[in-house]
Structures are given as structure tokens and as C-alpha cells.
Amino acid sequence: MTYTINADQVHQIVHNLHHDPFEVLGCHPLGDHGKVNQWVIRAYLPTAEAVTVLLPTDRREVIMTTVHHPNFFECVLELEEPKNYQLRITENGHERVIYDPYGFKTPKLTDFDLHVFGEGNHHRIYEKLGAHLMTVDGVKGVYFAVWAPNARNVSILGDFNNWDGRLHQMRKRNNMVWELFIPELGVGTSYKYEIKNWEGHIYEKTDPYGFYQEVRPKTASIVADLDGYQWHDEDWLEARRTSDPLSKPVSVYELHLGSWLHTAYDEPVKTLHGEGVPVEVSEWNTGARFLTYYELVDKLIPYVKELGYTHIELLPIAEHPFDGSWGYQVTGYYAPTSRFGSPEDFMYFVDQCHLNGIGVIIDWVPGHFPKDGHGLAFFDGTHLYEHGDPRKGEHKEWGTLIFNYGRNEVRNFLVANALFWFDKYHIDGMRVDAVASMLYLDYCREEGEWVANEYGGRENLEAADFLRQVNSVVYSYFPGILSIAEESTSWPMVSWPTYVGGLGFNLKWNMGWMHDMLDYFSMDPWFRQFHQNSITFSMWYNHSENYMLALSHDEVVHGKSNMLGKMPGDEWQKYANVRALFTYMFTHPGKKTMFMSMEFGQWSEWNVWGDLEWHLLNFPPHQQLKQFFTELNHLYKNEPALYSNDFDESGFQWIDCSDNRHSVVSFIRRAKNSAEFVVTICNFTPQPHSHYRVGVPVPGFYTELFNSDARQYGGSNMGNLGGKWTEEWSFHEQPYSLDLCLPPLSVLVLKLSQNAEENTVPAEEASNIA
């Protein structure tokens, strides 16, 4: 018998050794014979007993014969090029009909795509790599593409082939990317990549560009369509595009979706497309399940809106296998976690946030990734995404791996990922986690455990260039968004534009302010007189960066206690201290972030496997604290002086910061391009002060806009009967002054009234002890 193929080629297919199975499998011309073309069709079907080719154009059936191997089939045909032919397969006495995936040779990836990706500049590579719905020659299916340049062979696994890697072997393009179109697959298909290295070892990997994954502990990717959701937030996006977020109020409620609120496991699960499957919180909390993105719309959004926050910040919602990582050990960078529902459910959640005037910020983790076998680690049998040198590629303290920022394709993966969340999910900002760990080669390393850069320094120049690139790219596509750095060192110009040498973020967490505040407020008030610099030092460097003041999740874990537990004194003083701290925070220059549970005074630390102690809201002190935060947020949003001029020296002026004996500070906040200003006076001791004089620049009646000691917040209700007139008494180098009553452990906010009608406030709202 004459064969059209040699045994060696069959051997390579049978043993998953061929880099391009299209050279062997599928339909191939054999040559012309007059007006009739001769073609050969080949197929490798490891479990087939018999195979027949079905030709739709002339309704013929041709039986295939085996060649060199009992499961390698071929047949020779004389006709015009066969298209859309099918294979009828007999196995175990059953028949099934499929389209031959090797009969579809139209690639989605162009040579230009691969070239730009190789340069690290394909900003929307997520539209090419991964799994994408396609129609080829009138047949619907899914196109798969994965970057695995050092693999010997790559196959696609799934329920559709009984997870048999011999059936859907991919072809390699330009020594970089493997691709294959599989007809008749669709949304909801579970799949993985089977990657064989040159030593013959096999790895099963989740799709790095996959849009959806199975619920942990399962790890397969799931085909998803991200283009089917109908958005309703056009007005929000247009307003964002044309505005400057740094001149707007930014008050962020940071939360972890998996521990904000749970419900009973047997409660029906609501999703965008009907009833869903419950996801148990943990083996230690078997009676509870997570709320879905869809259910959170009715629970979380009204709550945040009532409290007055402008944004929510979600601890990482990209897919991660371990709940205890809080989301910071990501395996699915392009997949919102399936714990809470589908990609469309998350789109609906963001859409509804926007329709209710709430922006959405996500925590983004480009600094490291876990070693889980199904993830990015050792992806193609080599150190592909991570540095091969553990001195540059491993965080030993965290047990994670570090991205190779100097490799174009890795950098492209991350830059495109940041863009992806803004593009496909309409998010409004990203908070980049652990920036310091990226910027320093000796981060958490002893001498001899790190490698210097090309200039002999400890700065990771590749990481710095990457951060500049990602910020430049994201801003170029989506002006008006927030890019926030959690950077805990003195690296210069973090929030400066890239064109002047900065890293390009528009905000940086002020970690120094956070540490100073918590140290100061945790000490006995009597000792605060010796530490006045703790509350004033931040203004010495405030204008070196665009700062965000954050009291985050990191401050209520690992034995640090929650905010009330940090405060000294009896219960009344603890609440008063918390109110004073947050009022000072909201009147200090800088945007604001605070973690869930602080708004009602949870006593316990945050527990990722539980939910918040909502029962505390049955008790007046916690109700009053929640009301305090609601009114503080509304004060902040309603007074341009408190937000519009945060980052210019004209926006802040000390009145007096030297009265350490009384632990009192006072200052002016001025609005941008306006004569508006507010005066803030802070008394950080339990000792009230009557007839305390404070200088002011303009005469008139100063309304007491806010008093953290008001009765409705649980305070002693000392104050100034709604406001005070100035006296022509120069004080604090100001031409006029106010004779004030300063309540204990309190902060007052005063504003010059513009007319007599504003000089009084309702009695029930006024602090009534002068």
C-alpha cells in the first residue's frame, strides 16, 4: 500500500512532539490530475475504531484507513478543495460527528500582532491571546492562543475531549504563540492547556489570558463572552473623561467582597441570568455562602451611598486559589473571581455602582504571583513569567515569584492587563499593591541575596520603567481615572508625571502619615504634648507627592486590633478618639481611604473567613459612629475647601501648630480658585477648653459646620451654639480671632457665613454648651 505520509511524521503526532500538526493533519493537496484536484485528509483519533469523512458539497461519505498506527487515519479524494467536511467517529459502539479542527486554517493572530507583542507594545493583546468566540467558514467555535515559546508541544484539554491532550494539539507561530480553532465549542466550555517541555514533562495550566475560571478548588479556565453585556454608564464615563479626579472629592470605602457580608448557604442564589450555585465561605464556616456580585448590588451599593463615599476599593477580585491570601496571590489576572459570579455579573455590579454615583477602584497585583502548579509559575517548563535567578525572581518572605519586568512579553501581559480592567469592566481606578517590593532589588533580602542593577545600585530599573509604561498607557486610553501607589519608601516622584521623570501615578498612599497618626492616637493623651510633631510633620513633606491618606485593611490584622481597640482610655474616650482621628483625616490635605467596619466601630480584627460584626449596629454607640461617618463624608463632599486644592501649597495654612501644652492644632483649608475657606481646630486631650482663642483672616460670623463631639455622634455636646462672631483682636498672626469652646478629644470645622440667615442653625443640630 502507498502512504502519503512517512512513519516519523505519524510518530511525532501520536507522541505529541510536533510543533505544527497542521503540516500533517487536516486536508492537504496531493497534486493536479487534469481538471480534478487530489486531496488527502488525515486525522489522529486515539480512541476511534473507524472514521468516515462526510463531504457536505456532494453528500459523499468516504471511509478512512489507518496509516502506520491503529488510530491514525487518512483517505484520498478527487474533488475541488473540501471545505467544512466532518468526521463520523465510531468508538465503543457509539457514533459521533465532529468538524475537523485541522480543517480550519485561518489564523486570528497576524504576523503584525506577534511582532508588536514581541516588542511589548500590543496594548490589547487580550483580544488575541486566550479563548475567543469565532466563526470560521460559517462554523462557530472557539479560537485558543497561548504564549509558550519554550514548550515542545501544547494541547487543549477539556470535557469536549475527555481531557485527552492527544486530540487537540496546537500549532506554533513565529516560535512564540500556539493556536488552534476548535469548532462547535462555546461559552461555558471548561479548558486547560497541556504543555510538554523538551524533557517530556507535562504541565496542565490555566489560561493566563482566560476571562473566567472554575470556583476554587477547581482550576480550569472557562470560555466567556465579554462583549454581550449592555452597559448603561455612558454619562458617567464621559464625565470621568473630562474631569480632573485630583480636584474632586475622593472618599474611598475599601472592602473585601468575600467578608463584607455573608448569607445562609441554603438561601437561593441570585445572578444576572437567574438562579446560581452557592459557594461556601470555607470549611470552618459551612453554614454560610458568599453573596454574588448581583446580590451585592442591593446590599452594598445602598449602604455605601448612604454613608456618602465617592468610591469603593475592592481588595483583589482577580481569580486566586487561596482565600487566605485576601486575593493578593493571583493566578487569573484577566478573570474576576468566580466566587461571586460570572464576568457579566461583575459588569452589572460596576454598572450599577456608576448609576448610583459610586466609582470602582480595584487592587491590582503586578508585583508577584504564587507558585501554584496551574498558574504562571514555570509556565512552559521554563522560567517564563518570572526571573530564572531566584535572587531576582522570588519573594522568599511571601513564598511567591516576581515578574520579569525586563522581558517584553511579560511586560506586555501586565500592561495590557491593567488596560483590560478599564476597557472591559469600566473600572475607575487601580491601587497598585506593594510597589516598594517592585522598586528595590534588595527588598526583604539580606546581603548576598540580591543582584545589583547595571549601575551597581539597588533600584529595580526595569520595574520602574514598567510602572511608567503602564501608567502612561492607561492614561492615554482612559483620562480621568485614578492610579494609586501603595509605596512605603521615599522613592522620589512616585505621583509625578512620567515626562518629568516620575513613575506616573496620580496618587500615593501616605504611609508615613498613617504610622504617625496611629502612634499618636494610641498613646495616653497626657503624653501627646511631647509628640506634637507626629501630627504636624506630614505637612513638611505634603507637597512632595499627591498623597492619599489611608487607614486600610493592613492596620486591622495580625494582632494590631481594630481602630477602637487601638485607642486609649475608657469606652467614651475610645469613641471620641476615633471621631477626632477621622475628622482630622478628612480635613487634612489628601484624598481618603478607610477600610470596612471602621465606620461603625467593629471591636474585633478583620477576619477574612467571617463577615463583619453587623449586630453591633443594634447598639447606640455604633449607630452614632455610623451617623458620624455619614455626616463627615457629606461635609467633605460639600466643602470644596476640603478637596479641591489638596495638592497646592495655597490650599493649606497653619493657624497654630505649636500649642503642644494643650495638644491643640488649628489650620485653614482653602478652595481652588475661590475665596472659600474653612477653619479646623483640633483638641487631642480629654480636657475641654473654654475661651480658647484662635486667629482667623476675615471678620464675620463663623458657623460651626461640624463638631465631632456632638450629641448625635455620642459626644458630650460641648460646642459654640452653632458659631461665633470674630473679635478685632489680632492673634496667631491673623488680624481677627474667635473666642471658642473646644470640646474634649474633638475636632471643630468652622466656615465664614456669607449672610445673616446663615448665622443660626437649628437648635437640635447645634452643640449647646458654650
Curated annotation (Swiss-Prot):
Question: Which pathway is this protein engaged in?
Answer: Glycan biosynthesis; glycogen biosynthesis
Please indicate which superkingdom the organism of origin belongs to. Answer: Bacteria
Active site, per annotation: D433 (nucleophile), E486 (proton donor)
InterPro entries per UniProt: A-amylase/branching_C, Branching_enzy, GlgB, GlgB_N, GlgB_N_E_set_prok, Glyco_hydro_13_cat_dom, Glyco_hydro_13_N, Glyco_hydro_b
Q: Does the keyword Lipoprotein apply?
A: no
Report the GO molecular function annotations: 1,4-alpha-glucan branching enzyme activity; cation binding; hydrolase activity, hydrolyzing O-glycosyl compounds
Reported EC number(s) for this entry are 2.4.1.18
- Alphabetically list the UniProt keywords: Carbohydrate metabolism, Glycogen biosynthesis, Glycogen metabolism, Glycosyltransferase, Transferase
Q: Which GO terms describe its biological process?
A: glycogen biosynthetic process
Catalysis performed (reactions): Transfers a segment of a (1->4)-alpha-D-glucan chain to a primary hydroxy group in a similar glucan chain
Q: How does it assemble?
A: Monomer.
Purpose of the protein: Catalyzes the formation of the alpha-1,6-glucosidic linkages in glycogen by scission of a 1,4-alpha-linked oligosaccharide from growing alpha-1,4-glucan chains and the subsequent attachment of the oligosaccharide to the alpha-1,6 position.
Q: Which family does it belong to?
A: Belongs to the glycosyl hydrolase 13 family. GlgB subfamily.
Q: Which NCBIfam families match?
A: branching_enzym, PRK05402.1, PRK12313.1
Record protein name field = 1,4-alpha-glucan branching enzyme GlgB
